[in-house]
């Protein structure tokens, strides 16, 4: 466990919170903007490096405040350029952050919790259970660490990180306040200045918090659907028993409508061999989503040992995609990235594994995938 210093961690404070902090120590509010730029634009965690701040104020800040991100345990780089950081948070748990480069775009996949309580049956993160919510500093700290790793300072110039998705470990809407604060920092010009269209929150379907979301922020929304009917989704995504599909999709439509723009819901659908990849599932999905403006992202399952699931054949994936296309949907198939460093979708487990264990796991993944049809899939990259 990382020992607490008792000082105020400025890393996770929004502009409004930072201004209140400077009020509380008897300083002018404009200091908030100065300090935020040093922290987020330049990656500075040493008050003495803040050269446009008076020495007296720097000494005052050192006495009562700090800039402290999660502890970097390891950084791995995949053969395809994907990067994964394992970071330790104050609770002592480890979480993972993944960067996916693609042309001029670089997407950072950020975790919101250590572990996850939702226990989706095909997700390795859920297998470890729930450990703790991350603080706002620990959520935005993942962006801060990645940005510094790329040397992208100031953060708004020639940025490596163009998009952020809250699709890492955990259910973001079950850590609502801290995730909202972190997303505001992602979009704030004093933070990382990322467009609201390029910040996406992914949820498994916590309906009351989807309804609450529009009161606080207007980021893009992705729904982890994974099944076209309640009976199957109850098995794959147990929270569906509490918030079934009709209720869930209604809440998503309300949120998208509240944005007042031509923005659509992203549907995420992990494809599992002989479970949810059949023609009848595609037909059900077409009917289910007919009143929901959306784009669909098909995610071939990334196997992990003892999951009990397999990746569908390429023919099955292509057939499913074609049926949805023919019905008029915009459909993409997600390219698996970072599989050799356990950074692929559904593989994030927050464990610090030695090289031997990682190699064994990678071999197991390849063996589980061996039966998949070798025919190429026509992939539209997102």
Swiss-Prot record:
Record note on cofactor: Binds 1 [4Fe-4S] cluster. The cluster is coordinated with 3 cysteines and an exchangeable S-adenosyl-L-methionine.
A Gene Ontology molecular function term for this protein is: rRNA binding
- Pfam families noted in UniProt: Radical_SAM, RlmN_N
Q: Where is the Radical SAM core domain?
A: 102-342
Q: Name one GO biological process term.
A: rRNA base methylation
Which InterPro entries does UniProt cross-reference here? Aldolase_TIM (IPR013785), Methyltransferase_A (IPR040072), RlmN_N (IPR048641), RNA_MTrfase_RlmN (IPR027492), rRNA_lsu_MTrfase_RlmN/Cfr (IPR004383), rSAM (IPR007197)
A single GO cellular-component term on record: cytoplasm
Q: Catalytic residues? A: 96 (proton acceptor), 345 (s-methylcysteine intermediate)
Location in or out of the cell: Cytoplasm
Entry binding sites for [4Fe-4S] cluster: 116, 120, 123
- Primary location group: cytoplasm
Q: Which cofactor does it need?
A: [4Fe-4S] cluster
Q: Indicate which residues the UniProt annotation says bind S-adenosyl-L-methionine.
A: 170-171, 202, 224-226, 302
What is the disulfide pattern of this chain? 109-345
Enzyme Commission no: 2.1.1.192
Q: Does the keyword Zinc-finger apply?
A: no
User: Gene3D superfamilies from the entry?
Assistant: 1.10.150.530, Aldolase class I (3.20.20.70)
Q: Which reaction does it catalyse?
A: adenosine(2503) in 23S rRNA + 2 reduced [2Fe-2S]-[ferredoxin] + 2 S-adenosyl-L-methionine = 2-methyladenosine(2503) in 23S rRNA + 5'-deoxyadenosine + L-methionine + 2 oxidized [2Fe-2S]-[ferredoxin] + S-adenosyl-L-homocysteine; adenosine(37) in tRNA + 2 reduced [2Fe-2S]-[ferredoxin] + 2 S-adenosyl-L-methionine = 2-methyladenosine(37) in tRNA + 5'-deoxyadenosine + L-methionine + 2 oxidized [2Fe-2S]-[ferredoxin] + S-adenosyl-L-homocysteine
Say if the entry is tagged with keyword Secreted. Answer: no
Entry keyword set: 4Fe-4S, Cytoplasm, Disulfide bond, Iron, Iron-sulfur, Metal-binding, Methyltransferase, rRNA processing, S-adenosyl-L-methionine, Transferase, tRNA processing
Please explain the role this protein plays, according to its UniProt record: Specifically methylates position 2 of adenine 2503 in 23S rRNA and position 2 of adenine 37 in tRNAs. m2A2503 modification seems to play a crucial role in the proofreading step occurring at the peptidyl transferase center and thus would serve to optimize ribosomal fidelity.
Additional record remark: Reaction proceeds by a ping-pong mechanism involving intermediate methylation of a conserved cysteine residue.
The family classification in the record reads: Belongs to the radical SAM superfamily. RlmN family.
- What is the protein named? Dual-specificity RNA methyltransferase RlmN
Provide the organism lineage as a comma list: Bacteria, Pseudomonadati, Pseudomonadota, Gammaproteobacteria, Pseudomonadales
Tell me what gene encodes this. rlmN
């Amino acid at each position: 466990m990382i020992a607490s210093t008792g000082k105020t961690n400025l890393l996770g404070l929004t502009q409004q919170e930072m201004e209140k902090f400077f009020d509380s120590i008897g300083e002018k509010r404009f200091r908030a903007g100065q300090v935020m730029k040093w922290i987020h634009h330049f990656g500075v965690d040493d008050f003495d490096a803040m050269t446009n701040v008076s020495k007296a104020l720097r000494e005052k800040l050192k006495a009562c405040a700090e800039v402290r991100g999660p502890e970097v345990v390891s950084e791995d780089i995949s053969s395809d350029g994907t990067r994964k950081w394992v970071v330790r948070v104050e609770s002592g748990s480890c979480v993972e952050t993944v960067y996916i480069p693609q042309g001029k775009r670089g997407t950072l996949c950020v975790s919101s919790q250590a572990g996850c309580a939702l226990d989706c049956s095909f997700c390795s993160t859920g297998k470890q259970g729930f450990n703790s919510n991350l603080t706002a500093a620990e959520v935005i700290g993942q962006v801060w660490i990645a940005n510094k790793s790329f040397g992208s300072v100031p953060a708004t110039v020639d940025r490596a990180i163009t998009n952020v998705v809250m699709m890492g470990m955990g259910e973001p809407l079950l850590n609502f306040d801290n995730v909202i604060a972190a997303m505001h920092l992602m979009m704030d010009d004093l933070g990382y200045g990322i467009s609201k269209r390029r910040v996406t929150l992914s949820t498994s379907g916590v309906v009351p918090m989807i309804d609450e979301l529009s009161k606080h922020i207007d980021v893009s929304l992705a729904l982890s659907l994974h099944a076209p009917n309640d009976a199957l989704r109850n098995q794959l995504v147990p929270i569906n028993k509490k918030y079934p599909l009709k209720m869930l999709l209604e809440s998503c439509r309300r949120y998208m409508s509240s944005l007042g723009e031509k923005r659509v819901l992203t549907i995420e659908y992990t494809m599992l061999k002989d479970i949810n990849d059949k023609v009848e599932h595609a037909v059900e999905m077409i009917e289910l989503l007919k009143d929901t403006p959306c784009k669909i992202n098909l995610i071939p399952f990334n196997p992990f040992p003892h999951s009990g699931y397999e990746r569908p054949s390429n023919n099955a994936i292509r057939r499913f995609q074609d049926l949805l296309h023919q019905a008029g949907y915009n459909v993409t198939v997600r390219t698996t990235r970072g599989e050799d460093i356990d950074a692929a979708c559904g593989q994030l487990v927050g464990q610090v594994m030695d090289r031997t264990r990682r190699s064994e796991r990678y071999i197991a993944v390849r063996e589980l995938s061996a039966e998949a049809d070798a025919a190429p899939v026509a992939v539209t990259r997102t």
